[in-house]
Amino acid sequence: MSEAELVLRSTRVITPEGTRAASVAVTGEKITAVLPYDAPVPAGARLEDVGDHVVLPGLVDTHVHVNDPGRTEWEGFWTATRAAAAGGITTLVDMPLNSIPPTTTVDNLRTKREVAADKAHIDVGFWGGALPDNVKDLRPLHEAGVFGFKAFLSPSGVDEFPHLDQEQLARSLAEIAAFDGLLIVHAEDPHHLAAAPQQGGPKYTHFLASRPRDAEDTAIATLLAQAKRFNARVHVLHLSSSDALPLIAEARADGVRVTVETCPHYLTLTAEEVPDGASEFKCCPPIREAANQDLLWQALADGTIDCVVTDHSPSTADLKTDDFATAWGGIAGLQLSLPAMWTAARGRGLGLEDVVRWMSERTAALVGLDARKGAIAPGHDADFAVLAPDETFTVDPAALQHRNRVTAYAGKTLYGVVKSTWLRGERIVADGAFTDPKGQLLDRA
């Protein structure tokens, strides 16, 4: 074994070549070698033997609403990154809303970076925002290091982040395409939403009818057409409607540069199980029926959907009323995303390698961090999650690190206990004990 400061050893290490018994050598913050399990440990190196627990690359979550500054009663960098670390996530990319100010100018980005600097327990990057009136700010934000730009095609739910109409979408895409940036889009069509029945109240079936599939499908079709027009890179956020999958496949075949994500809640929860009045299950677009979920899983398997991210979007408990029309829409999932996905994947005969591909490898590639994140390979950051995949636990909201311990998974039994999480060669959480914040702020490569 070459010189190393740390050797992390397991009978099951997930590498790009597959799962095998291995000794992972780490020097400083980087992986220097992935060697045979019984390779000799160099003098002076610290051996951490985790037995048959699985060592996987730290997850990369590219869709997180930290809400800091401005709405820290909802979340914040300290609590969000602790929750992420507890769940095996070592990198997150923060959405430009629901913070105040939103990340829509270089000055606002600077404010957010200053707030995050000493609070991040994991590595953190930032998305910019595309608004009707900030086209002039997009290139400066790109040059300042944001990973891309988020836009809404329907109202966002917060006044400081208005949505784009079709003309504004075209202007933003033209500008972003000029420097080959990435536009990530909440795709629901406002006209279809306005035409849908808006009964309100506690019945989930009424809420589901108010966010119909055709609102997603129409908005995605609009986005794909504009992406083709400008040869722009676009990414569909939190896909819920399986009806849009053929549109996406056809666009790709036609050369449109589009990637797609979905979320654990769409893959693990179903409309049929949502109790009336239980707005901890509310998100937009909504959790849909079991048959729709099956098609999302098929799309993950065949590659139509690229990756899985949390869309962690918490609020204070008082905003989660029993009226689905007025309750805040968002699911807090950072700490539970890995066990929730692993539980569902194993139930469908899929492996941890699949989960790693969707939640680490491909998310790192989405934001251009795949040269250093998303894989256990020489030259990559020494980011690891150590998982006991066959151990189970029952979700207790009191055990969550989120600022507001509201969860749609309360009382569920999940497979996969995160035993420890490592960031750039240092163990940052083990058995619920955290180090001081060690996270770095990341720029687009």
From Swiss-Prot:
Keywords: Hydrolase, Metal-binding, Purine metabolism, Zinc
One Pfam family it belongs to: Amidohydro_1
GO MF annotation: an example: allantoinase activity
EC number: 3.5.2.5
One GO CC term, this protein: cytoplasm
Known partners and oligomeric status: Homotetramer.
Classification via PANTHER family: ALLANTOINASE
HAMAP family xref list: Hydantoinase
Its job: Catalyzes the conversion of allantoin (5-ureidohydantoin) to allantoic acid by hydrolytic cleavage of the five-member hydantoin ring.
Full protein name: Allantoinase
Gene name of the record: allB
